[in-house]
Amino acid sequence: MKIVLISGLSGSGKSVALRQMEDSGYFCVDNLPLEMLPALVSYHIERADETELAVSVDVRSGIDIGQAREQIASLRRLGHRVEVLFVEAEESVLVRRFSETRRGHPLSNQDMTLLESLKKEREWLFPLKEIAYCIDTSKMNAQQLRHAVRQWLKVERTGLLVILESFGFKYGVPNNADFMFDMRSLPNPYYDPELRPYTGMDKPVWDYLDGQPLVQEMVDDIERFVTHWLPRLEDESRSYVTVAIGCTGGQHRSVYIVEKLARRLKGRYELLIRHRQAQNLSDR
């Protein structure tokens, strides 16, 4: 049976993610105490029900992270396919969302401010985030989050999933990257007026960057580094690794490098490509 555990920071979009799972055909349960998860799985097995399960777990249920990781390991030992989806957002974004909705944080009380509650929750859930596929919703609306969840569900995973993500430094760095590489020292197509309107997916930019020896040297170096270290992470039973590639605006160099790496790694690893700034190319 396939089981998806959805967790993350309050205000980051867990409910939206769970609704998308339901729309995708999953049997969904919100805020299930973890000690009840084996009983839920057994119930569906006894009914010969092949429905895929999506369960939201968070601080409201007094989640014990050590217990959560043990539950995941136990279910996997029984042959179930267990995935963890973790949604998060920047602190300032979460504060704004709580202010707009006028809802209280689950950990808020007279002795703890909203910021303190968010910090405690982030620290509490970090061990779960370490084994999860992470979606940062800071710059997403509900529709974009739903799209990101749908794209994640499309990837058939039997081993390590490598997420290749392009981004622009001027918009901030991804907070869920395992490896991050800076492309700002490479020749920039942006300064060519004819290339500026294009992205790193378009042939004119490809032809330009393909002809730059420094760019090809960078691709070779990143490929060598990544292929050296990914097997070690796989040995640690990691399910996901995010490789973030950044340039100034996230439109040309970083997109090109991600696509180039994807072509080289295809067939060796399961890949998910994300272009954070080039929205029309995202989550293919």
Swiss-Prot record:
This is Nucleotide-binding protein NMB0738. Displays ATPase and GTPase activities. Gene3D superfamilies: P-loop containing nucleotide triphosphate hydrolases (3.40.50.300). It comes from Neisseria meningitidis serogroup B (strain ATCC BAA-335 / MC58). GTP binds at D58, V59, R60, S61. The lineage of its organism: Bacteria, Pseudomonadati, Pseudomonadota, Betaproteobacteria, Neisseriales. The keyword Nucleotide-binding applies. Keywords: ATP-binding, GTP-binding, Nucleotide-binding. NCBIfam families: PRK05416.1. Transmembrane segments: none annotated. One of its GO terms (molecular function) is molecular adaptor activity. Belongs to the RapZ-like family.
